[in-house]
């Protein structure tokens, strides 16, 4: 039987090769899913750790404990450290492969009042000991405590303690309330001032500049003080920095479980990343659903291709099947024969498809946009054994789809076969109007989704998993509309045929006859072509819309190409016994002009920003408004506002109005509505004191005349969200000079507009070279790149691109299969036409006409279906990906380049197919066919 099957494969080598190709793509598409999922989850997890570290400016994955041991049980630092080490060993035992990259443990005695011998400020300080500290410190003044050789106990202070207390090296610190049994007070001599050797050293999880009460002594000194002064307890705080690169999608659930158990069993246990792990579990569900939902249309197309090719094979072997039945073969034997053939093909498909799936996953992971690739870091996407299991499951489904037409045709006898050939049956969906029903169901679901769009947005904001039915409904709509359009095309072709059937030339008449009589056979490839074009266009538009709206919101929120703010010094002073005032010391502003002078930037603007503002009119008062003080000319040349927001009145008009009114202010629309004011009214803008002052102290007030009310403004985000809770913000903009006059000079941001071809790193290098210490930094290009690197965006772009590429390849092959089979089957008919007097040119013209009234309408219909689906569904997709309320509405983008890419690829496909078909027609043994036709 195996030999017979191999002979069958050899006899139908081209169709079998196409079937094998379909199985290969099925195995590849399914087997790449676990690899893509694992890589995406690992990347999402790693990105969450990186982002958390950058936001907190601290190492992201830390576990620890704070506590104390009574000195009756543990009287030395070593004994306390042994106790702490016991906890650390317990954590290490359960966390397994998640090793520590560093550990910081601090032992302290209770704080006591200290007084410097040179009259430094009295302050409560703690005697502290930190193991291995000297290996990570740099002594700025004096010497470390190991080199200290005086009679008094020696200690080291950080720069922050020295600055806060005014102590100096060599000064003796006395603790008058801390006495030993003989009544002698504790005295420490400052032997050195230190700072960390490297600010990026993970040893310093708690940095020296944040330790404002610690005096560090050696272990021997610490033990001697404990022994002499007998404190009640020794406090400790230990922080273990875990290697987060070892936390991945395989072990993250175990890590989360053990961290939760540590908290449950030990109230003093602390961690910095449990919330990240919980958020990961929520996002994981979304990624699981998104991957499958985005891949289902592709799997449907591949399975349809397999079914179509199998149908072509069965059509050519119907006579053979009927003969086998007439010779006594049972249906089960015939099905078993084809099942064996399918198993052989699936085995080969596994060998080819699994490595191909690996390559396709790498391809999908490298996408930054639809059909746009960037070879970045793909190390997290690697082979996983589960791919083989998925490949086997895909092979089983492929075998099932191969056997469906076999089972249908295996019971046909020779008599039934001959009679069926004379009947031009309607397709099932056409006969029972299934296309109309499915289209109605899809539109009904779409209507329901649009009615519940606020609920969908709310669920997305709360982190609930997305509803896959929304994505599946878009696929259902495209399929149903494709079938409806195909039905209409059939009616249209019949209408054109009937209108001109008495006028058509023979070649044209024959082509219309071929189209109308073979609609069932040709309909399948037409549907495949329509779906490929429609889904390709829809995927391109959906990906472009999601990407561009993300980018627009980032661009709007950033306001300019670069925003930075330097750390300013605050000088506070008493104005009375109970009141404090302060002045800010402005850093040298000359260095900010350097990027413009070097041609890296075209403009620069100073922007005073604060949200410590209240705006009032009459008895109505709105607190915590966002305030901007701007130079209108510089701001207009530097800031950016999307064109969509400038359609009615360009925002430069508002800047001109503000420039003409010294005390003018611009209000956001929601603030104007809350205060019930309009242009020309006057509002009071009061600024409150910063951290060292009481918040109710008004630092200054501007009585401003409203010159404009705006819906949007560069850098102003009206709504922000935290844990699903919405917070609305208000904006007021004033002139820079009036701001400084009323509120005094205060920290401002520097906004830059980059020159063409310059990236933000070049500007950052210039700023860093000047020694500027920044408290805030935002770069638009980095933010956009980070967005494109997120797991969800990569998955969306990757799956849309992958689906289109595979569908296009299969469409081209399916297109060739149909036309090659059609021409092969019509070789005798061509001979008859030639015998009737048709020339070779007329035969070619007949084929061209068939393409014009079958292939071209299918492509145009696919474009129409994709366009309508884009109009109806893409905005809904945008709400799922971007559920937050925003000053920018979700715009649907139809990029001409995406359409041109699609058209170019389709044209290449069609031209290639036409070239192959022309060569095939020329290679036909037309002389023999002509003789058969004459006979």
Locations of regions flagged by a protein language model:
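N-terminal Sec/SRP start-transfer signal
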Residues: 1-28, 34-35, 420-438, 486-533, ...
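Membrane transport/envelope proteins' first extracytoplasmic loop
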Residues: 1-303, 312, 366-371, 378, ...
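Alpha-helical membrane-protein architecture signal
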Residues: 2, 332-336, 340, 426, ...
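Interfacial "coupling" helices/loops that link adjacent transmembrane helices in transporter permeases
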Residues: 12, 304-345, 412-428, 435, ...
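Small-residue-rich transmembrane alpha-helices
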Residues: 307-310, 319, 343-375, 385-414, ...
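Short cytosolic juxtamembrane segments of multi-pass membrane proteins
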Residues: 378, 410-429, 884, 919-935
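Juxtamembrane segments of multi-pass membrane proteins
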Residues: 455-471, 475-653, 669
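C-terminal transmembrane helical bundles of large multi-pass transporters
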Residues: 748-750, 772-875, 882-889, 913-916, ...
């Amino acid at each position: 039987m195996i030999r017979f099957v191999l002979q069958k494969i050899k006899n139908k080598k081209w169709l079998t090769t196409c079937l094998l190709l379909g199985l290969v793509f099925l195995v590849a598409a399914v087997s790449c899913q676990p690899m893509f999922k694992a890589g995406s989850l690992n990347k999402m997890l790693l990105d969450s750790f990186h982002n958390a570290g950058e936001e907190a400016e601290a190492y992201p994955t830390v576990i620890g404990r704070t506590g104390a041991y009574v000195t009756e049980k543990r009287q030395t630092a070593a004994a306390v450290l042994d106790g702490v080490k016991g906890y650390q060993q317990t954590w290490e035992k359960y966390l397994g492969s998640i090793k520590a990259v560093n550990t910081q443990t601090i032992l302290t005695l209770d704080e006591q009042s200290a007084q410097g011998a040179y009259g430094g400020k009295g302050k409560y300080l703690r005697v502290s000991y930190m193991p291995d500290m000297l290996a990570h410190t740099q002594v700025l003044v004096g010497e470390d405590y190991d080199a200290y050789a005086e009679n008094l106990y020696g200690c080291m202070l950080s720069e922050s303690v020295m600055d806060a207390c005014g102590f100096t090296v060599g000064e003796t610190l006395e603790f008058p309330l801390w006495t030993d049994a003989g009544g002698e007070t504790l005295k420490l001599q400052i032997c050195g001032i230190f700072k960390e050797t490297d600010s990026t050293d993970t040893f310093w999880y708690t940095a020296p500049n944040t330790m404002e009460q610690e005096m560090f002594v050696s272990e021997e000194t610490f033990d001697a003080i404990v022994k002499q002064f007998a404190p009640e307890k020794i406090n400790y705080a230990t922080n273990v920095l875990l290697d987060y690169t070892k936390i991945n999608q395989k072990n993250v659930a175990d890590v989360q479980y053990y961290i939760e158990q540590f908290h449950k069993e030990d109230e003093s246990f602390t961690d910095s990343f449990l919330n990240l792990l919980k958020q990961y579990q929520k996002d994981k569900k979304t990624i699981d659903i998104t991957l499958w939902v985005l891949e289902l249309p592709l799997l449907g197309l591949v399975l349809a291709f397999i079914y179509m090719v199998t149908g072509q094979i069965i059509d050519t072997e119907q006579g053979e099947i009927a003969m086998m039945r007439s010779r006594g073969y049972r249906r089960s034997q015939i099905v078993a024969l084809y099942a064996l053939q399918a198993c052989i093909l699936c085995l080969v498909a596994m060998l080819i498809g699994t490595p191909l799936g690996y390559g396709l996953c790498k391809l999908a992971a490298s996408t930054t946009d639809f059909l746009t690739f960037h070879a970045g870091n793909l190390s997290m996407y690697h082979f996983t054994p589960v791919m083989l299991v998925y490949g086997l499951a895909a092979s089983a489904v492929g075998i099932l789809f191969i056997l469906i037409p076999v089972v249908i045709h295996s019971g046909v006898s020779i008599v039934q076969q001959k009679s069926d050939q004379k009947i031009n049956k309607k397709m099932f969906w056409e006969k029972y109007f299934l296309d109309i029903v499915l289209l109605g169901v899809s539109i009904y679901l779409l209507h329901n989704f649009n009615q519940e769009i606020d609920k969908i947005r709310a669920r997305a904001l709360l982190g609930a998993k997305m509803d896959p039915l929304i994505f599946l409904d878009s696929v259902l709509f495209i399929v149903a509309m494709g079938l409806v359009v195909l039905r209409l095309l059939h009616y249209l072709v019949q209408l054109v045929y009937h209108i001109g059937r008495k006028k058509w030339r023979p070649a044209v008449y024959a082509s219309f006859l071929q189209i109308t009589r073979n609609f069932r056979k040709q309909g399948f490839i037409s549907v495949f072509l329509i779906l490929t074009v429609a889904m390709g266009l829809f995927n391109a538009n959906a990906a472009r819309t999601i990407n561009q709206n993300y980018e627009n919101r980032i661009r709007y929120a950033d306001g300019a190409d670069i925003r930075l703010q330097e750390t300013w010094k605050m000088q506070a002073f008493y104005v009375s016994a109970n009141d404090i005032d302060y002045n800010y010391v402005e850093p040298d502003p000359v260095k900010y002009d350097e990027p413009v002078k070097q041609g890296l930037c075209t403009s620069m603007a100073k922007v005073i920003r604060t949200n410590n503002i209240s705006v009032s009119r009459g008895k109505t008062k709105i607190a915590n408004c966002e305030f901007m003080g701007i130079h209108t000319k510089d701001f207009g040349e530097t800031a950016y506002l999307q064109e969509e927001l400038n359609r009615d009145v360009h925002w430069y008009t508002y800047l001109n109005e503000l420039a003409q009114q010294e005390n003018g202010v611009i209000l956001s629309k929601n603030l104007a509505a809350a205060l019930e004011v309009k242009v020309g009214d006057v509002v009071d803008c009061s600024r409150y004191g910063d951290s060292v002052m009481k918040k109710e102290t008004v630092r200054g007030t501007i009585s401003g005349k409203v010159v404009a009310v705006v819906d949007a403004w560069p850098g102003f985000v009206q709504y922000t969200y935290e844990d699903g809770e919405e917070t609305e913000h208000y904006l007021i903009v004033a002139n820079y000079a009036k701001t400084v006059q009323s509120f005094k000079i205060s920290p401002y941001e520097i906004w830059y507009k980059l020159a063409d071809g310059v990236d933000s790193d070049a500007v950052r290098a210039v700023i860093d070279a000047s020694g500027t210490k920044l408290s805030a930094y935002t770069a638009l290009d980095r933010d956009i790149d980070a967005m494109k690197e997120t797991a969800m965006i990569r998955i969306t772009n990757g799956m849309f691109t992958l689906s289109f590429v595979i569908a296009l390849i299969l469409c081209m092959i399916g297109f060739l299969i149909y036309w090659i089979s059609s021409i092969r089957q019509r070789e005798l008919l061509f001979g008859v036409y030639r015998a009737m007097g048709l020339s070779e040119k007329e035969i070619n013209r007949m084929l061209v006409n068939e393409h014009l009234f079958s292939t071209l309408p299918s492509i145009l219909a696919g474009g129409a279906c994709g366009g309508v689906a884009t109009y109806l569904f893409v905005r809904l997709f945008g709400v799922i990906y971007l559920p937050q309320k925003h000053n920018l509405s979700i715009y649907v983008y139809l990029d001409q380049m995406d359409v041109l890419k699609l058209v170019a690829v389709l044209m290449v496909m069609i031209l290639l197919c036409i070239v192959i078909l022309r060569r095939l027609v020329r290679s036909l043994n037309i002389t023999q066919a002509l003789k058969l036709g004459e006979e």
